[in-house]
Structures are given as C-alpha cells and as structure tokens.
Amino acid sequence: MIPELNYLKETGFLDVQAIYTAPGLHQVPEELEIQLQKQLEIAKKSAKKIIVVFGGKYCYINMRDSYRTIDTVIEEMREDGYYIARTEVENCLDMLATVDERKTLAEGQKVWFCTPGWLKYRDMVFKGWDKANANENFPQYTGGGIMLDTIGFFDDYAMEHIEEILDFSDWASIPLESRTVGLERLKDVLISAMAEEDRL
C-alpha cells in the first residue's frame, strides 16, 4: 500500500508520519513480525495514535503457531497511553475493492488481483520464486491479472517500464491489465481504523 498511502499524503488526505515494513513479508512471517515490532516501537516515539495498515487473514500466517495472528503481534505492542489499531480487512485487495466489487471486475472469470505495490516491488513480493513457482500458481487464473489501480499508477508505470510489465506477464503466463477503482474504499478503511474522536 506504499504508493496509495504516499499519494494520500501528497494530496493532503493523510497528515501522518508513514513508516513501512518491507514489501512482500507475507511470505516470511517471522521477518514481518520482527519488522512490525520494530516499526511500532519507532512510531510510538513520535505518535500516541497509530494505525497499522495491514490485512488480517492472509497477510500474516504463522505456520509454527496458527493461533498467533497479526492482531496478537499488535496486541503485544499495546501499552497505556497509546491507541493502536489495525485496518479491519482480510488483505490489501480488500483495502481497495470489496469482494463484491472484485467479482464485478472479474466478470465471471477466475482473475488474479493485485495492487500497484505487487508490480512495483515484485522482486520482493515474489522473492525466491522461479518460473516453476509461477507456473504452479498463475495459470489457474484463466481471466488473467487485474491491478486495482486507485492512483493512475499502471499507465504512468507503463510509460517508463513497459518491458517490466511484459516480463512479469511472461513470467506469470497471464496478461496483466489495470482497472481504475476510486480511493473511497481505502479512505473509508483508514477512517474506520481511527480513534472515534478523530473520525471525519
């Protein structure tokens, strides 16, 4: 969500200090936990109210302890005097479009959805993947790939990096296109995570 959150800061919707974990850590939950704890400690030095912009169900899966969730990690970081909340979504896709909205965009096809960050940071998101991993995962999406684009990222990125988009499509063996979705959903998700007295 780095491109989207930076855009909301640049356009004045967010007046926050944004601190990020590295992209793609849903594949490495131990590292995600370490980075999240570190970033929350940094955030607590400059803010009393903190929102963790992260999905719940699919973004942190601890194979060693299935009862340990992202919310468990966040709960352990709570202390008196701080408001810490997580965005109430299952994954990053839910921040940009609901399940029903994605079904509409898919038009009855089996589609792989992504956000701009998945393309921009693909080397980190798909770290350790080779063509065999891609062949195991992507061809099932017979409807191709759709990027949920809230900020015009895809067209701008294609102007300078068309080869990277084509390389990704070739590697994944599916075409990748974008669909414009508004920022309203993301704004609503962020507002819902705010302390009640701060909601617009």
Per-region residue spans from a language model:
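C-terminal, charge/polar-rich interaction regions
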Residues: I151-L200
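Long, charge-dense
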Residues: I61-D123
